Amino acid sequence: CIIHGPHEKHLTNYINGFRCQKCTPKSSVEYEILNLIPSSTINNRTFISPLEIDILSEKFKFGIEYNGLIWHSYGKSSYEVLNNLSKLDKNKHSNKTNMVEEKGFHLFQIREDQWLNPIKKEIWKSIILNKINQSKRIFARKTYVVDLSNFPKLIETFLNENHLEGFTDYDICYGLIYKNRIYSIICLSKNDSEWELKRFCNFRGYLVVGGISKLFTTFEIIHKPTSVITYANRNWSSKNIYGILGFNYIEYIEPEPEWFNPKNNNFIRVPNDINIKNNDLYNNGFRVFFGCGKNKFKKVYK
């Protein structure tokens, strides 16, 4: 493989067109995900024709895209199909999500490195199982709220193990406790007079019915905000939950470039003002990936 070097491959796989397993592990992963979802189809080419959806569940009204990093990114390469900077389109994934949402469905876009990470893989499984009503349920009325703000290590561990974006800075954090275990967490920070809802997540495999409403209402009663904003990652989030809390949609935020080394799929931090189409990162083998952007919501109190 031009990207990953020499590797062994069974003759049958070669005949069937399967190349380097680091570049094209997609098929086996798709079937792994497919097995989680009853009555779903793979490689649907009719729902948003001519584009394809990797996995589609018409019963539960959602689809899943598995985005291999090599084939869904842009960069320079001696391999012609990967030498694709001239075709750079930062809205490619976002546009597909738009097409699915126009049909009244929700689209999850799973990034390859997330599925290959054992913890994030379990988070994704939890998200999918929740979508098909297979999560274990706890009713918020059976829980009680605790202020966790002074327990940063506990919060960090919970977020890293249960939220795809992991830990973030915060000013306050509340949790829901049931039988001496934390099942939900909400984190907010304050900038001048405006608050931001930065994280909410449940314990993997569980859905706390009414949990986010109970936590957010607690915050409102104690802190009496004048306004709260939040940003929803369109790779997995839907608009519905924010409407329940009284938020209004404000705007769509375009996806930011995410840079990674294709030899190990490690992402790096890069200054925001870097030239996307012309920089030394490409010459050093790095590639750029674009997600689906974010939706901004705001709640204003009168």
Predicted stretch roles:
Residues 55-60, 176-179, 299-301:
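Active-site beta-strand termini and strand-to-loop segments that position acidic
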Residues 148, 189, 200, 300-302:
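Structured loops at beta-to-helix junctions and adjacent beta-edge loops in soluble globular domains
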Residues 248-262:
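Conserved catalytic-core motifs of GNAT/GCN5-like acyltransferases
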Residues 260-282, 287-302:
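C-terminal "cap" of GNAT-fold acetyltransferases
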